[in-house]
Amino acid sequence: EWSVQIGAFDTQESSTAALKSAAKKLPRSYVMATKPQIVKAKSNSGTVYRARFSGLTRQKAIEGCRILKNCIVLSNTE
């Protein structure tokens, strides 16, 4: 399973807003096939909320990142 991470944010609200904004740039069928996800994580500067579209194949994750441009593709082990 692969994911597209669109950013890491200081608040859960910012992460949710980023997912909604990114979803508007992607084809509806693409968004419907994903699992939007917010992953809470610790960083050196405190807590961050990582906004991701998960549940993708590697190829679909790459396609999504090509559309969004400012993102990273992750395998489920990352």
Each PLM stretch: what is its role?
Residues 1-3:
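Short structural boundary motif marking the start of a folded domain
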Residues 10-78:
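Extracytoplasmic
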Residues 6-7:
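Local beta-strand/beta-hairpin segments that build beta-sheet-rich folds
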